[in-house]
Every structure is written in C-alpha cells, then in structure tokens.
Design a protein with these regions (language model features):
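Conserved ABC transporter NBD signature motif
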Residues: 58-72
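Conserved ABC ATPase "signature" region
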Residues: 99, 112-130
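Conserved ABC ATPase signature
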Residues: 134-138, 142
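Conserved catalytic motifs of ABC-family nucleotide-binding domains
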Residues: 155
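Catalytic Walker B motif of ABC-type/P-loop ATPase nucleotide-binding domains
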Residues: 159-162
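H-loop (His-switch) and adjacent beta-strand-loop-beta switch element
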Residues: 207-220
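ABC ATPase nucleotide-binding domains
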Residues: 222, 226-228, 232-261
Length: 261
C-alpha cells in the first residue's frame, strides 16, 4: 500500500531566503502525526506545499499519486490557520460554510445525500444548533468548530490541520481532540496536525515531526520521549514538550522523563 503522504527533497524560499531545506518523510495510513517546531520554522509553509497551495521544489505524492496529477481532493480535509471564509464578510450561514467542503459538488442543487453529510459533520462537531446562523455572527471558537465540520464533511481519509485548537475554549478543545482521536482510532483517518498543545493532544499522537527549516526529527512518540539524541538535537524545546506530555500523563511506559504510566 502506498504512503498517504510521501515527500522527497522539498525546498522552498521567499525572495531567495530559505524557508524549508531538503525535507523528506513519509506518512503512512493511520498515522497521527504532531508537527511541532518554533514559530517561523516553516511548518505552515510545509502544509501548503503538500496541498499545492505554495510551489517549491522536490517531489510530493498523495495516496501514491504525483501532486500535479492528484484529483481525489475529497479524500483530504484541510483546516487552515487563517481560513479565507473567516476573513471574508460574505453573509453565508454556518451550514453553507460546511457545504463548501464538498469538493465534488456541482451546480446549485443540494442532494439528500449531501445534506446527510453536512448534518453528520455538524453533529460530530456540535455545531448543528447554529446551522442557520450567519457564520460571521458566531464567536471565533464557534467559527473554528464550523470550519472543522467543513473539513470533515467529505468524510476524508486524511486530515491536515494547522493549529486548529488556537481559538477554542477548554471544553471545545477537549471535544475537538477527542473527536480527532476517535476518527483516527476507529475509522483509520490519517492526521497531520500542527500543534503547540502537546499536553491535550499528546495521548492520541503516534508520531512527532519537528521542523525548523530542516527536518530535525521524525519518529514515534516513544522515540521522541526516550531518546537522549532527540533532547540534544532539540534542546529546551524538546524538554518542554516532553514535560508537557509527562504533566498530562501521556509519556509512553518506560520514558526516561518518568512520565510513563
């Protein structure tokens, strides 16, 4: 079975200033990858390269198909850090925003099947109660949950999420990460997620990927927590992340930090 994401030799620069250098990795079906690293390290740019939203050099395959030939966008749900929908003032309802996530939709009619998908996605994200409200009248946290529903509406096999919990309150964050964990564990949805919230999401993540212009680390949570080499490479950031996992009880059994349970 081909990798869900395969990247080889990715490079990107803004006006000749390197942002990403020689990034290579593979994400397998069923992985839950936490993409971490310092601000300005190229994490968001990397996601945009994978989705064809930025153009760099190197090779990208999605579900075994070269990015330039990839057509099955319904297999991918994407939640950007700054969504164009959030920045637009066009008066659309929350339900209409979710409907936008059906990439295969054509024409003005909405089928019964599409409505069922919208209902299911909004039910999962607890946004059904304000389906008819204007999107921009919602709070920032409510908007974020609607945008998650839009990412889920096509029932994707891969979710790519850029700091999705930033605007959420504690209760919504817990719901959000529990939902992602369930989608990964029970439905086999592959997840690639930029996060600084390693405590709450740490119990679900299976692999960590650390990017700071270059790929510094890619491996399992166990390798991340137990390896002295990782701590030496990443320094204070690694220790902060491991401490966060430890404090929430999500370090693997036998982790050298003492947090395994």
């Amino acid at each position: 079975m081909p990798s869900v994401i395969e990247a080889r030799g990715l490079r990107f620069a803004y006006v000749r200033v390197p942002v990403l250098e020689d990034i290579s990795f593979s994400v397998e079906a069923g992985d839950y990858v936490g993409l971490i690293g310092p601000n300005g390290g190229g994490k968001t740019t990397l996601l945009k390269l994978l989705l064809g939203l930025e153009k760099g050099s190197g090779e990208i395959k999605l579900f075994g198909t070269e990015l330039a030939q990839f057509k099955d966008w319904h297999k991918i749900g994407y939640l950007a850090q700054k969504s164009p929908v959030s920045q637009s003032r066009f008066p659309v309802s929350a339900e209409e925003v979710v409907l936008m996530g059906l990439s295969s939709r054509r024409g003005s009619g909405v089928s019964a099947g599409e409505l069922r998908q919208v209902y299911d996605a909004m039910q999962k994200t607890r946004t059904r109660e304000y389906a008819g409200r204007i999107f921009h009248d919602l709070s920032v946290g409510q908007q974020q949950r609607v945008l998650l529903a839009r990412a889920l509406v096509s029932r994707p096999e891969l979710l790519i999420l850029d700091e999705p919990s930033t605007a959420l309150d504690a209760e919504s964050r817990e719901m959000f990460f529990n939902l992602l964990g369930e989608l990964n564990a029970k439905r086999g949805v592959t997840i690639l997620l930029i996060t600084h919230d390693t405590g709450e999401v740490g119990k679900y993540i299976s692999k960590f990927m650390y990017v700071d212009k270059k790929l510094v680390f890619f491996g399992t949570k166990e390798e991340f927590c137990r390896s002295n080499e990782v701590a030496e490479k990443l320094g204070a950031f690694a220790q902060h992340t491991i401490d966060h996992l430890h404090n929430h009880g999500h370090c693997p059994l036998g982790c050298s930090c003492g947090g395994g349970k």
